Amino acid sequence: MGKQQWKFLMEIIEMNQNILITSAGQRVSLVKAFQKEIKSLSKDNKVYTVDLNPILAPACHVSDGYRTVRRVTDPNYISELLVICKELDIKLIIPTIDTELLVLAEHKDLFLSEGIIPVVSDLEFVQACRDKRIINTFFEKHNIEIPKNLDKKNLSFPLFIKPYDGSLSKDTFLIENESELTEYHFQNEKLMFMEYIDHAKHDEYTVDTYYGRSGDVKCIVPRKRIFIRAGEINKGVTHKNEIVNYLKSRLSHIEGAVGCLTMQFFFNRETKRIIGIEINPRFGGGYPLSYFAGANYPKFLIEEYILKRELDYVEDWEENLLMLRYDDEVLVHHYEN
């Protein structure tokens, strides 16, 4: 390491390099991961959290401190968040829910002008990820197969219905036959009718990918969803299978994409057919499995955005690592409602 690099590193270590995780909720593992990595630079570095109701958010009590924020849809959300960032000397903002991504992407330059980096992809890409019609076009453009769209006047069964802007399995329907269809299905213009992907033949995978500042992929970790609870993985296992090279060849670069992107795919166990479902440009609830497997995205973010280092593509994470989740407790003493 040269003298200039050493001087820069010492300056970084001596300065507070605090991180803010928004809508922290139950993301205890994510908070702990960032704490471990940022405190390896200096024990004085902090990971703070914000939430609409932090006193009832376990991750807020695990963090180094928390603040209350109004709803992300409130017109004053951004100005309030900026004040909090200045008070806590925040360097990186890590958003965790879809609605935050849009707002932070729209106001990214405002935070950057204050020396605060929201780790969020460009607005155009965030908007595309929020609309399944657009992301389907994105998949097709990159030669990734998608479920077949069905004509509402010429349906075949079984079929699957979901909204183009939905999340957490809200308003999704598996339709076995015509008698199960209602006026609601046809009158709701947001609902998409599509091919049903048979779970008896396909495994569902969440893929934790990391994209560097230039939009180049740096890591790809497929994790099979064994059991889902409340829309989030409860049991899962990492696999180094065909999906890795499939995505590496097709999505080696995504313009405007940065940080952790959580992608959903179906994988046919016999034919090896891979079907793209969606992309969420943020940390997913099941990311801790990839972290424990060695895909250290919190460290990647710190290296890129704080230490200003270039990242190489890495694939030295642990395959066949099984994660089994269970409920744990965070106790708050002297609580008054």
Briefly describe each language-model feature range.
Residues 2-119:
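ATP-binding N-terminal substructure of ATP-dependent carboxylate-amine bond-forming enzymes
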Residues 54, 165, 281:
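Short, glycine/acidic-enriched loop or turn micro-motifs at the edges of active sites
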